[in-house]
Amino acid sequence: MLFQPNQRVRLNLAGLTVNGVTFHAAVTDALGTIIKESSGNPPGYLVELLFSFKGLKEIEVPEDRVRPA
């Protein structure tokens, strides 16, 4: 699924570790806004989180963990 910049999305962050922060199993429905598609393998998106998690406000999330809000 292709998401556009400024699109509101829901994220399943359970089990992901980003910049030393591990998201617990309960973080399956975080809200965010797509900033841009990121080049990576697997493909993903740079997302601005609605709420900061342990100081993280922007994170890269694999495409399979993103869905429309």
Model-assigned labels for residue ranges:
Residues L2-A69:
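Basic/aromatic-rich interaction segments and small domains that mediate binding to polyanionic partners
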